Amino acid sequence: MGRQWNVLFDVVTSTYASFPYSPYMDAYKPELGMAAGARTNNALKYTLATPDRKWVGTLQYSFGEKNNTSSVANMALPALGAATGGQLTGGSNLNQGIVAPVGPGGSLVQVNTVKGVIDGAVANAANDPNPNALKNAVEDVGMGAMKTFGGFLRYSANGLSLGAGAMRTTLPGGSDLDAYTLGGSYRTGPWYFNAGYGLNKYKAVGTGTTSGSYINYLVDRQILNKMWSGQTNGGFSGGYFENAATKRQMIKLGFGYQATKQLNLGAHFFRAKQSGSSDGTYNGNANFMVLAADYAFSKRTDAYAAIDYTKVSGGKGLNLDVASQARSRTGITIGLRHRF
């Protein structure tokens, strides 16, 4: 029991990994963005296998341990309440008007709504490239224990490996993320071929009618966005508000070739489709390509190099960088690794 790789990560890396000779070599791993965070806290795992290990199956369960959004609400609501002269509290109706003195006479005029104030604070925090209190509070909740249940089944024989996995994650605010993956690989001589499919379906808790319930919704949405938009996962956003995407699919194809005893080469292509955005802002596609080479100097020391390319298209909310709004990116990785 403890912080462990989840069953989705296990089945992908053990059955149809992008770079099987060293699945942790390259930091560019779009398929791991479909693995619900890849690691799970407070996890229990139970594995069964046939004596020849042709069949392997694992079940996983983790405890939520009262991880909830109250820390974010306790931090955000007093600050927003002070900024609005005490007009915003945890029980405030989302449509309630926020008034302020306007003009020479100081007449009170509605300048915003409770929902508008919260949305503005979230947007400012999300678009700020630097750490800030609101993002840090949400990230602390996201790093806490969440309730999960899932499993995987794998078959391997004569160079062929097939596997499938599924897992449900209940987020702190009450939303559910259902994640599925299936795929396979085949080895023959120096060649390795792999293909896989991943699906994430997000079932959001309702926005409710009060600021407190709306914060639950927004925190869950941000945690999902963190899983989806990390740079190692491809790095494109699913959105933050009611027009956010709720479904992401990905296919991958690739091959590896062991050119010599020391030199391994690989090329992989991934295509993702994002949908569910109510106004289309976050609906679209993403293509990922990566070429990599690894040279082993010894059993414990190797050098590697990779070049990757990412391009997104579709709704105006799809981009790879908040500041520049870039829709394409090229990355180069070079490294030397020694295992102690």
Language model regions located:
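Extracytoplasmic loops and strand-loop junctions of Gram-negative outer membrane beta-barrel proteins
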Residues: D26-P30, N132-A137, Q231-G239, Q274-G276, ...
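Outer-membrane beta-barrel "beta-signal"
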Residues: Y295-F297, A326-F340
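Outer-membrane beta-barrel and related beta-rich outer-membrane complex signature
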Residues: V11-A17, T69-A73, V205-T209, D279, ...
